[in-house]
Amino acid sequence: MNLKDITDPSDFKTTKLPALAELDILKRCYICKDLLNAPVRTQCDHTYCSQCIREFLLRDNRCPLCKTEVFESGLKRDPLLEEIVISYASLRPHLLRLLEIEKVESKQEVDREKSANESASNGNRNVNNDVDETVRVKDQSNADELGEEKGQAQHGEQVNEQTTEVISLLSDDEENGSDSLVKCPICFERMELDVLQGKHIDDCLSGKSTKRTPTDILSPKAKRPKQITSFFKPTIDTKTPSPPTSKASTTPTATPTTTLLKANVSSPSPVAQSTVHKGKPLPKLDFSSLSTQKIKAKLSDLKLPTTGSRNEMEARYLHYYVIYNANLDSNHPVKESILRQQLKQWEMVQHQPSFGDAEWKGAETGNWKELIARARSN
């Protein structure tokens, strides 16, 4: 196994959401500290990997957490939790990547704010240096502005006279024709009733109406054909079938975040399709009541090797008994040939020569002396 494949809740401690480490811990087995694999629940409502708790119960029949007596026959599968853990395991690297991206972006924002503050402080220094020059320029421009203001005042008087005339006309029109003017319920503009019942309501509802100018209001009424807008007309049910909605239109638009989460994420199979297991669990043998020949016959029936001593054959059966029954607890069981391959690898590890503490110290003596010499030299 590659070291990069090893996960730990502390991976989230350096991200933008360090609290996700607690969520990661809840999805791990208390015995192996890895993400739950084929989780089962004990009678005391604690959850472990099926293989982990079965191997533990071979040595001790008490719960590792609360020390309550636990029986292997009372283990209950948790298929929903297994699918949740599988989904979380597939999303975990993408989640870490997204949180790391946000962390980098927030760091860039801090750098931009810092540079903006520095430029603002430099700008304040330049402003202080230019105050005297600005005062001199203003003194010179004041004389020119006095001449311009005289001309603008004369022009402003003419504009004010024209504006006063328009406002007075509008106010007179509102006072004299207040009985004939009505207010639009959409834009609250006052107008004649026939104008309101014409195209104005439709234009207001569709957003096409424009602001009426004083010229339009003050102009004499043109003879218009009396029309009733569709707003006041009774609705007629034509009973025309609506076109079927295409699936593409109802599909939500994918965002960069959802695209990243969907990339390389395989959706697990439904729980209902994977909870059916045809195999039967293997029984736990009482080796004290079985002869060596019967043990060999049991191994032969399971297509397992019958070589080695009696103790080796008993250990072989017990380990296969654990991984076989744990495989039945999984939503995604593997073939028996793969289980036999796992058993073979396990036996190879068990037959490796043991490396004691004394031998390890002797082999590493040279390295220890070199490290001590480096520490003293520093």
From Swiss-Prot:
Transferase as UniProt keyword: yes
Instruction: List where Polar residues composition bias occurs.
Output: 117-129
PROSITE patterns, per database record = SAP, ZF_RING_1, ZF_RING_2, ZF_UBZ4
Instruction: Classify the source by domain of life.
Output: Eukaryota
Q: What reactions does this protein catalyze?
A: S-ubiquitinyl-[E2 ubiquitin-conjugating enzyme]-L-cysteine + [acceptor protein]-L-lysine = [E2 ubiquitin-conjugating enzyme]-L-cysteine + N(6)-ubiquitinyl-[acceptor protein]-L-lysine
Report the SMART domains cross-referenced here.
RING (SM00184), SAP (SM00513), ZnF_Rad18 (SM00734)
Please, one GO biological process term? DNA damage response
UniProt xrefs under Pfam families: SAP, zf-C3HC4_2
Cellular component GO terms, alphabetical: nucleus; Rad6-Rad18 complex
Q: What is its main location?
A: nucleus
Q: What is its EC number?
A: 2.3.2.27
Enumerate composition-biased segments (Low complexity).
245-256
Query: Binding positions for Zn(2+)?
Result: C184, C187, H200, C204
Compartments, record wording: Nucleus
Under the subunit heading, UniProt states:
Interacts with E2 UBC2, forming a complex with ubiquitin ligase activity.
Role of this protein: E3 RING-finger protein, member of the UBC2/RAD6 epistasis group. Associates to the E2 ubiquitin conjugating enzyme UBC2/RAD6 to form the UBC2-RAD18 ubiquitin ligase complex involved in postreplicative repair (PRR) of damaged DNA.
Family per similarity comment: Belongs to the RAD18 family.
This protein's name: Postreplication repair E3 ubiquitin-protein ligase RAD18
Q: Which organism is it from?
A: Candida albicans (strain SC5314 / ATCC MYA-2876)
